[in-house]
């Protein structure tokens, strides 16, 4: 007997006034282009769910029993300014799938048509942006970074007008929750404190049930949100990921990555890297992300000020920097091959990063090559990458000396370092190549890239071309917010 997912929509049942009910608006000539087999397996969906009769679900043409589609309302700060009411302008929450382990997963259809919150938009998504989000969310997941996931890509013959005419598409996004900082801001700025508390109680009962009824449940919950967000920033910084649009309406209350737009991974190590060509002031530059996340948490704290005292809010927010520094320190030590802490570790890290800045070295390649270092060999696989050999040799001498303090052998250390230093990341030019071919109905590059990204830390000789340094044109792609 075929497995039938069990759906609910607690958001619809428990949070009246927080959404608008509506049906998805199908695209003309919609067809399933691609899906994530690993995610499908996690959701209990076999191959039959991705054959022609079932395509209607992924294309917004049919609903499964228990689904109650709705668009959520929220507000937010965008580029540091209060933007007022926003909401799901082109996405519809179809329902929540109950998994065998008791968890619930939102099914959210992006590009599903106009909603009351579309503002000046058309409610649609283009194939280009759908493929980028699919690949990015799958890439971050396999890098071990908390993120929403992407299950299906639907393409169509429906023309969508952006800077040029593009194909309309839909993405089925999966996450434990789509609640954002901006949900709380919306009701706070509308002077609806009961709704703020109602939403907080819903989130705590759903995702932090251990604190229901606790005298300080709101402080404990907010502190965990702060710490989760801090750890997420540490993950982003260590892999060289820039989100690009860290508005409060794009910040998850669960501390996961969501709302992929003009994101980018570092090629050359440029701390001030700006991936969004609309970010003229560099607010969301790579090296500014941890500070912006804290600013956003302060905005969330302000929205929650009716639930906690000022001292409780401050105490929760003060957990951010220690959580960030601990997580970042642990992850960067792992990238350097250090199991134990040492007073010289930070100098060695900043020394290497300074060399990379000075010579424009590739972030991912440098750390991956570092994983091949042999402690007792004066020859480094990295040396030929640097022009200033004297400066590198001085750093490398100190680095080898530090490695000799570790209690594991080369093989063990190299394996642990490779598990912290990916070989394959989603470079913008690789995503663009996959998009270009998919727009011609050739999904082989998309499929191949997706396959490589599922094992980013493993040497896969058949995908060596996907680990190569980008061509010059590939380093300077400007990514638009239009999607």
Swiss-Prot record:
Keywords: ATP-binding, Magnesium, Manganese, Metal-binding, Nucleotide-binding, Nucleotidyltransferase, Transferase
Protein's UniProt name: Protein nucleotidyltransferase YdiU
Cofactor: Mg(2+); Mn(2+)
EC code: 2.7.7.-, 2.7.7.108
Family stated for the protein in its record: Belongs to the SELO family.
Binding-site positions, ATP: 87, 89-90, 110, 122-123, 173, 180, 259
UniProt function note: Nucleotidyltransferase involved in the post-translational modification of proteins. It can catalyze the addition of adenosine monophosphate (AMP) or uridine monophosphate (UMP) to a protein, resulting in modifications known as AMPylation and UMPylation.
Lineage: Bacteria, Pseudomonadati, Pseudomonadota, Gammaproteobacteria, Enterobacterales
Molecular function as annotated in GO: AMPylase activity; ATP binding; magnesium ion binding
Positions that bind Mg(2+): 250, 259
Known catalytic reactions: L-seryl-[protein] + ATP = 3-O-(5'-adenylyl)-L-seryl-[protein] + diphosphate; L-threonyl-[protein] + ATP = 3-O-(5'-adenylyl)-L-threonyl-[protein] + diphosphate; L-tyrosyl-[protein] + ATP = O-(5'-adenylyl)-L-tyrosyl-[protein] + diphosphate; L-histidyl-[protein] + UTP = N(tele)-(5'-uridylyl)-L-histidyl-[protein] + diphosphate
A Pfam match: SelO
Residues in coiled coil: none
Record carries keyword Manganese: yes
Domain of life: Bacteria
Active site: 249
InterPro entries: SelO
């Amino acid at each position: 007997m075929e497995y039938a997912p069990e759906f609910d929509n607690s958001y619809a049942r428990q949070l009246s006034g927080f959404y608008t009910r509506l049906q998805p608006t199908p695209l003309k000539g919609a067809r399933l282009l691609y899906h994530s087999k690993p995610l499908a397996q996690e959701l209990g969906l076999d191959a039959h769910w991705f054959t022609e009769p079932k395509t209607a679900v992924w294309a917004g043409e049919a609903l499964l029993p228990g689904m109650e589609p709705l668009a959520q309302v929220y507000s937010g700060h965008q580029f540091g300014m209060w933007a007022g009411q926003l909401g799901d302008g082109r996405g519809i929450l179809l329902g929540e799938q109950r998994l065998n382990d008791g968890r619930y997963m939102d099914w959210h259809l992006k590009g599903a048509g106009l909603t009351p919150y579309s503002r000046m938009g058309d409610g649609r998504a283009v194939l280009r942006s759908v493929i980028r989000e699919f690949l990015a969310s799958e890439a971050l997941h396999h890098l071990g970074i908390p993120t929403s996931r992407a299950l299906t890509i639907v393409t169509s013959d429906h023309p969508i007008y952006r800077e040029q005419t593009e194909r309309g598409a839909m993405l089925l996004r999966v996450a434990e929750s789509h609640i954002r900082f901006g949900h709380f801001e919306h009701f706070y700025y509308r002077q609806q404190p009961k709704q703020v508390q109602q939403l907080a109680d819903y989130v705590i009962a759903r995702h932090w049930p251990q604190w229901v009824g606790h005298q300080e449940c709101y402080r404990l919950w907010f502190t965990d949100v702060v710490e989760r967000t801090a750890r997420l920033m540490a993950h982003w910084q260590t892999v060289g990921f820039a989100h690009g649009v860290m508005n409060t309406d794009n910040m998850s209350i669960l501390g996961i990555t969501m709302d992929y737009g003009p994101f980018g991974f570092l090629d050359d190590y440029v701390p001030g890297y700006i991936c969004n060509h609309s970010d003229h002031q560099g607010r969301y530059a790579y090296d500014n992300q941890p500070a912006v996340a804290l600013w956003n948490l302060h905005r969330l704290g302000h929205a929650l000020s009716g639930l906690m005292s000022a001292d409780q809010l401050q105490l929760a927010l003060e957990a951010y920097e220690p959580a960030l520094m601990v997580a970042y320190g642990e992850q960067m030590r792992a990238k350097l091959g250090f199991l134990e802490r040492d007073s010289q570790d930070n100098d060695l890290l900043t020394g290497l990063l300074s060399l990379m800045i000075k010579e424009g070295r590739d972030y991912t390649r440098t750390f991956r090559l570092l994983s091949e270092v042999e402690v007792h060999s004066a020859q480094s696989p990295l040396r030929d990458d640097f022009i200033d050999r004297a400066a590198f040799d001085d750093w490398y001498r100190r680095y080898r000396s530090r490695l000799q303090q570790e209690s594991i052998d080369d093989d063990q250390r190299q394996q642990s370092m490779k598990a912290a230093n990916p070989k394959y990341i989603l470079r913008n030019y690789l995503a663009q190549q996959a998009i270009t071919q998919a727009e011609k109905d050739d999904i082989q590059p998309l499929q191949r890239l997706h396959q490589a990204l599922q094992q980013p830390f493993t040497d896969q000789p058949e995908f060596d071309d996907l680990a190569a340094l980008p061509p010059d044109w590939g380093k300077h792609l400007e990514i638009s917010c239009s999607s």
